């Protein structure tokens, strides 16, 4: 059955993940990403953010618990191309001999037959996606020749070409200049207004309150979640980050107030 919902939520229910070395990466994580919103996933390095992302995308099988996308299992959501993923830079082989156009076309693979011959619609959507992220002039460039911000925009274009209603972005602002970050944030807000559900993992705490509707705080388990103005507090951040000095948190909040 094809998904008929125009807006899809992400439901994570009691998810735990244990790696082969018996290390517990995620414990009893329960949270909801509301449909048609931008939600920030925040936590220190090693807190399980990427593990949670990979569990939602179906790249990892939880040892317990389940994930649902708009009420669908992850497997059904994958088959229906409901989800798109923008990975961290270190997950990509930048030496692989593919062009930007080829990378964005990969977002259409789920709609093609085994021969992977692009249709006119596939090519049109790829070009429209490149246009939307401002990367048309780089379409023939080898992916490894791009700057950090251009690489992120290329993979965001791939997510757009895939036409997934749910978009996950893992640290999309790392290695990106301020202008590129603002452009990406503006586009994410447009996508939200169009009905996309967006989950974004980020270390850029200062910008979260400017564009994220909700925030989830994670450190091996979910510590707090809710509307950003209610959840993104110094007290909750101290709980999440542990030893992060109060001075750093004060500076971050002062920076946010000035930028706003």
From Swiss-Prot:
PROSITE patterns: ABC_TRANSPORTER_1 (PS00211), ABC_TRANSPORTER_2 (PS50893). Keywords: ATP-binding, Manganese, Nucleotide-binding, Transport. One of its GO terms (molecular function) is ATP binding. InterPro entries: AAA+_ATPase, ABC_transporter-like_ATP-bd, ABC_transporter-like_CS, Metal_Ion_Import_ABC, P-loop_NTPase. Pfam families: ABC_tran (PF00005). ATP binds at residues 43-50. GO terms for cellular component: ATP-binding cassette (ABC) transporter complex. It comes from the Bacteria. Residues 10-245 form the ABC transporter domain. Part of an ATP-driven transport system for manganese. Belongs to the ABC transporter superfamily. This is Manganese transport system ATP-binding protein MntA. It comes from Synechocystis sp. (strain ATCC 27184 / PCC 6803 / Kazusa). The gene is mntA.
């Amino acid at each position: 059955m094809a998904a008929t919902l125009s807006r899809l939520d992400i439901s994570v229910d009691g998810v735990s993940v244990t790696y082969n070395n018996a290390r517990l990466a995620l414990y009893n994580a329960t949270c909801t990403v509301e449909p048609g919103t931008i939600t920030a996933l925040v936590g220190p390095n090693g807190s399980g953010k990427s593990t949670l992302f990979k569990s939602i995308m179906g790249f990892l099988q939880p040892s317990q618990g389940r994930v649902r996308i708009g009420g669908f299992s992850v497997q059904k959501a994958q088959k229906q191309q409901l989800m798109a993923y923008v990975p961290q830079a270190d997950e990509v082989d930048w030496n692989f001999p593919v062009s930007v156009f080829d990378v964005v076309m990969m977002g259409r693979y789920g709609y093609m037959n085994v021969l992977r011959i692009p249709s006119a619609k596939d090519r049109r959507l790829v070009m429209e996606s490149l246009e939307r992220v401002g990367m048309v002039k780089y379409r023939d460039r080898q992916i490894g020749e791009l700057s950090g911000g251009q690489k992120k925009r290329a993979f965001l274009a791939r997510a757009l070409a895939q036409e997934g209603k749910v978009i996950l972005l893992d640290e999309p602002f790392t290695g990106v200049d301020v202008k590129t970050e603002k452009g990406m944030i503006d586009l994410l807000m447009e996508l939200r207004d169009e009905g996309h559900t967006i989950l974004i993992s980020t270390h850029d705490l200062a910008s979260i309150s400017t564009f994220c509707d909700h925030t989830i705080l994670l450190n091996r388990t979910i510590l707090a979640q809710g509307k950003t103005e209610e959840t993104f507090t110094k007290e909750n951040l101290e709980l999440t980050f542990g030893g992060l000095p109060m001075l750093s948190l004060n500076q971050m909040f002062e920076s946010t107030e000035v930028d706003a």
